[in-house]
Regions:
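Short, conserved phosphate/pyrophosphate- and ester-handling motifs at nucleotide-, phospho-/glycolipid
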Residues: 33, 185, 248
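Alpha-helix C-terminal capping segments
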Residues: 28-39, 258-261
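Conserved N-terminal subdomain of the carbohydrate kinase-like
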Residues: 39-124, 296-308
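Positively charged, low-complexity intrinsically disordered leader regions
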Residues: 1-11
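Conserved phosphate-binding/catalytic region of the ribokinase-like
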Residues: 142-143, 194-308
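Conserved beta-alpha-beta core of the PfkB/ribokinase-like small-molecule kinase fold
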Residues: 119, 125-204, 220-222
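Short catalytic helix/loop segments, enriched in acidic residues and glycine
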Residues: 11-29
Length: 308
């Protein structure tokens, strides 16, 4: 999506100038993985307008393969506005109804392309856009399962995009049940299962079929669960958060990077925490996705602090 942000802090209605950047959960993760040195592709649909062209140009420049992105001449590219009313109070306003991305269908999927991947990363945002987007997500998941591609699901709950909360819950529970790795935050786990302990959430998701569950705690780190092990991995303190949007996507990129490289789960989650923390230090959704050197420097600093 194209993301518009007022150049000043305060109510958006008082803004006179805006900056435009590129954002969106799945494309943020793609950029994050590319900056960490991985081959990654993004499947979507954009309008054949200037915003759509800007998105493709930006992602290509970041090394993301956009060869399976379709351009739609009959629908606009989705946009959203990000308002920072005050420090640590960021609000977003979506304009995605009828967008090009909302017109994705299973026919837009390339089975061979998905089959060649190691992981398929999906979120709960795409199925919120339209009924055909829901069909497309489940079709992509079915392709992945047929070819042994592991599915990583980040609920990324955005109730503003859903017509009914019950429908959102129903769809996301089905997605979780058909995924190998599930990455909810505390609010998302509570939405899906009610207010319980982190251990209860982990147990429920494992019971639905996931082999790895990671419960994100924001600045406080994360818990991860497998059928054999549960561990808490602390986060990285950030003195001043510039922009929290995109931190969860950074976490997903960091975790996927660790899994792709065969790191121990504790190390993979630590990398995820580090990437998520670094993202918050820069304004913009994907702009703050760090490069490998930055991530390793932060992790090494933690190790040095522990050994002192």
């Amino acid at each position: 999506m194209a993301v518009f942000t007022p150049t000043s802090v305060g109510l958006m209605r008082q803004a006179t100038t805006f900056t435009m950047r590129i954002g969106g959960a799945e494309s943020n993760v793609a950029v994050g993985l590319a900056r960490l040195g991985h081959r990654v592709g993004w499947i979507s649909k954009v309008g054949s307008d200037e915003f759509g062209k800007a998105i493709l140009s930006f992602l290509k420049g970041e090394g993301v393969d956009v060869s399976r992105v379709k351009m739609d001449g009959e629908a606009p590219t989705g946009i959203y506005f990000k308002e920072q009313r005050r420090l640590n109070d960021t609000r977003v306003y979506y304009y995605r109804k009828g967008s090009a991305a909302s017109r994705l269908t299973p026919a837009d999927l390339d089975e061979k392309y998905i089959a060649e991947a190691k992981y398929l990363h999906i979120t709960g945002i795409t199925p919120a856009l339209s009924e055909n987007c829901r069909e497309t997500i489940f079709a992509a998941m079915a392709i992945a399962r047929r070819h042994g591609v592991k599915i990583v699901f980040d609920p990324n709950l955005r109730l503003k995009l859903w017509n009914e909360a019950d429908r959102a819950k129903e769809v996301m529970l089905r997605m979780a049940a058909e995924s190998d790795v599930v990455l909810p935050g505390e609010a998302e786990a509570s939405f899906l299962f009610g207010k319980h302990s982190v251990e209860e959430w982990g147990s429920r998701l494992l019971g639905m079929g996931a082999s790895l569950v990671v419960i994100k705690l924001g600045a406080n780190g994360a818990h991860y669960f497998t059928n054999a092990h549960h561990e808490y991995v602390p986060g990285f303190p950030v003195e001043r958060v510039i922009d929290p949007v995109g931190a969860g996507d950074g976490f997903a990129a960091g975790l996927l990077s660790g899994l792709l490289e065969g790191l121990r789960l504790t190390e993979a989650v630590q990398r995820a925490n580090a990437v998520g923390a670094l993202v918050t230090m820069v304004e913009g959704d994907a702009d703050g996705m760090p490069e490998r050197d930055d991530v390793e420097r932060l992790i090494n600093q933690r190790r040095e602090d522990v050994t002192r």
